[in-house]
Curated annotation (Swiss-Prot):
This is F-actin-capping protein subunit alpha. GO terms for cellular component: actin cortical patch; cellular bud tip; F-actin capping protein complex; incipient cellular bud site; mitotic actomyosin contractile ring. The keyword Cell inner membrane does not apply. The keyword Transport does not apply. F-actin-capping proteins bind in a Ca(2+)-independent manner to the fast growing ends of actin filaments (barbed end) thereby blocking the exchange of subunits at these ends. Unlike other capping proteins (such as gelsolin and severin), these proteins do not sever actin filaments. SUPFAM superfamilies: Subunits of heterodimeric actin filament capping protein Capz. One of its GO terms (molecular function) is actin filament binding. Heterodimer of an alpha and a beta subunit. The lineage of its organism: Eukaryota, Fungi, Dikarya, Ascomycota, Saccharomycotina. Keywords: Actin capping, Actin-binding. One of its GO terms (biological process) is barbed-end actin filament capping. It comes from Candida glabrata (strain ATCC 2001 / BCRC 20586 / JCM 3761 / NBRC 0622 / NRRL Y-65 / CBS 138). Belongs to the F-actin-capping protein alpha subunit family.
Length: 262
């Protein structure tokens, strides 16, 4: 396949709505043919890693990311395993034992995150605590997905941080993607950069940051609905008369103008 084709496929996959990768894959195969399968699967693999998609590994959700990728496999230091991935079906394969050193602070973060997710995130929620090569640094990832295709919407929350214990610094991003597609096609994305200093308890700080982010989102939704959208609506006179829709719409001035292209 040409480089241009590869780029187009990657861009389409990159913009795929949360929870709809298999549908996008089938559509691309229909359009581009079976010969494009390898290119599409490679793009899906990049998508899964970039979005820290949870993979089903023997019935457990395990996040994959750039932080726990080792060669062609991924490691889960918390559960002590390493595995390959079927990226299309998001399944773990060839599971093997894996040992990693997890210090006391990281163990505390694992416990605290488990409690935080169980009381604050709906749907399918999981997290990862990943020791990095620099011993003072730990990657913390939270992913919550809620897919409801029967009601035409899917949602994906990802927050990703790196905590430097020596510097007391927490940096990362919070990302939300929602797709609503009943009688329309609306895709919502919100992202926030995080950079905090003098942090001693990373999970406590994450709770505060994410609670504030959620509050700000709610306020922006309220403002959008009650102010911005209302200003877009055209004010029409109230006639208190029932409009006869259908062919009779041509009897009204608005209908005649529309029919005549005015």
């Amino acid at each position: 396949m040409s480089n241009d084709f590869d780029t187009i496929i990657k861009n389409i996959i990159k913009d795929s709505p949360a929870g709809e990768l298999e549908e996008v894959y089938q559509d691309l195969i229909t359009i581009a043919g079976e010969n494009s399968k390898e290119t599409i699967i490679d793009a899906i693999a990049e998508y899964n890693v970039e979005n820290s998609i949870p993979i089903d590994v023997d019935g457990k959700d395990v996040i994959i990311s750039k932080y726990n990728k080792q060669g062609t496999k991924f490691v889960d230091p918390v559960n002590g395993i390493q595995f390959s991935v079927d990226h299309l079906h998001q399944k773990g394969l060839d599971v093997e034992e894996y040992s990693a050193d997890i210090d006391a602070d990281q163990k505390k973060a694992i416990t605290d995150l488990g409690n935080y997710l169980s009381t604050n995130f709906p749907g399918r929620a999981t997290f990862a605590v990943l020791p990095l090569e620099e011993q003072s640094k730990t990657a913390i990832i939270i992913v919550s997905t809620k897919y409801n295709p029967s009601n035409f919407w899917n949602g994906h929350w990802k927050s990703e941080y790196v905590y430097d214990k020596t510097e007391g610094k927490l940096s990362g991003t919070i990302d939300i993607d929602v797709h609503y597609y009943e009688d329309g096609n609306v895709k919502f994305h919100s992202s926030k950069l995080v950079e905090e200093t003098n942090i001693k308890d990373p999970v406590a700080s994450i709770k505060e940051l994410e609670h504030k982010f959620e509050q700000d989102l709610q306020e922006s939704f309220t403002d959008l609905n009650e102010k911005q959208f209302k200003s877009l609506r055209r004010r029409l006179p109230i006639t208190r008369a029932r409009v006869n829709w259908g062919k009779a719409i041509g009897n009204y001035r608005l209908g005649r103008d529309a029919a005549q292209g005015k």
